[in-house]
Regions:
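Beta1-alpha1 glycine-rich phosphate/pyrophosphate-binding loop at the start
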Residues: 5-9, 14-98, 207-208, 271-273, ...
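Short beta-strand to alpha-helix junction loop
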Residues: 69-87, 99, 183, 253-262, ...
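Rossmann-like dinucleotide-binding core of oxidoreductases
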Residues: 2-4, 8-10, 14, 18-34, ...
Length: 335
């Protein structure tokens, strides 16, 4: 027997929870359900467990306008974000709308009936079920949760040590006092590397090409003053608008004056790392700022790890894996 709802939401992560809130608020007469393949809410924030997992945008804008972020850290650690999402689900009575362990397998649309038919499978039992709905709202994100993307590297099977994908991080992984190579310099890498640097013997951050990286304050003094003067609840709309304005100005500045923006970003790295570091090789991208995402690091934690000698930067192309490390096109081998 089919189950009919007006709106079917796929995914109980940050987007799916927001969709449910607005449906309840703006369309209280409409029925809906949330299908979630896993056994918990949170999506990315309950799946990813690698060291240092955090938001790479401030939570005042990344979080909900209808549920104020009240932690002091703007760029929050993963567990704090998951706690925040749990709080939103409880606050707005969304939990009873979620069908956990339910994976969407197939969808079809009937023009004659103006209905979607959605076939699902119970992850635990394998049983199938069909839903019908007038609107299907996809809030699944863009990750394949069971297997992250892994490039093909020549000779990778020869490497004798463990190879770990951050998306599939296991809490039992022991990297204490070991040399680690982290491939990439995007948002995941700039989060992972500083968090591992206090425990690992040394980390090499291997990138094919540089990224723009900006240090931002973790505990913004302006936010702190507004909270003290107005309180958490009344200050939140102002703090949110301030962060939106700051991000918009950064973007617009980069679009209108790309060369000046480039000097600003690279100048910040030069100031953080001091003289003697090859900024041009490792931190000057070939593209203009905001042609790709800007990576932000709270309180310059990545730069501090580099400055203290815990992390080395290598900019080169991978030729192949070896038994003990990675051979680069330049002829150098990293172990």
């Amino acid at each position: 027997m089919k189950t009919h709802v007006d709106v079917l939401i796929a995914g109980a992560g940050i987007s799916g929870i927001a969709a449910a809130y607005y449906l309840q608020k703006d369309c209280p007469d409409r029925s809906f359900a949330i299908l979630e393949a896993r056994d918990t809410i949170g999506g990315t924030w309950s799946l990813f467990r690698y060291p240092g997992i955090r938001s790479d945008s401030d939570m005042y804008t990344f979080g909900y306008s209808f549920y104020p972020w009240q932690q002091p850290q703007a760029m929050a650690p993963g567990p704090a974000i998951l706690e925040y999402l749990d709080g939103a689900v409880e606050e707005f009575g969304i939990a009873d709308k979620i069908r956990f362990g339910t994976r969407v397998e197939r969808m079809s649309f009937s023009t004659a009936d103006s209905l979607w038919t959605v076939r699902t499978r119970d992850v635990a039992t394998g049983r199938t079920h069909e839903y019908t709905c007038n609107f299907f709202w996809g809030c699944m994100g863009y990750y394949r949760y069971d297997a992250g993307y892994t490039p093909e590297f020549e000779g990778i099977e020869r490497f004798e040590g463990p190879i770990v994908h951050p998306q599939l991080w296991d809490d039992d992984i022991d990297y204490a006092d070991k040399r680690v190579i982290v491939i990439g310099s995007g948002a995941t890498a700039v989060t992972l590397v500083p968090a591992m640097s206090d425990t690992a013997a040394h980390i090499i951050m291997l990138q094919r090409s540089p990224s723009y990286i900006l240090s931002v304050p973790q505990d913004d003094p302006i936010d702190r003053v507004l909270k003290r003067l107005l309180g958490e609840k009344r200050s939140f709309p102002l703090i949110r608008r301030k962060h939106i304005l700051f991000s918009t100005m950064l973007y617009q500045f980069a679009q209108r004056f790309p060369e000046r923006a480039k000097r600003f970003y690279i100048g910040g790295v030069r100031k953080a790392l001091g003289p003697g570091f090859d900024i041009e090789k490792h931190f000057r991208p070939s593209y203009a700022p905001w042609d790709q995402r800007l990576c932000m690091v709270p309180d310059g934690d990545l730069f501090e790890a580099i400055r203290l000698g815990k992390v080395s930067m290598v900019t080169d192309h991978i030729d192949s894996f070896t038994e003990r490390g990675i051979a680069l096109r330049s002829g150098e081998e990293l172990e």
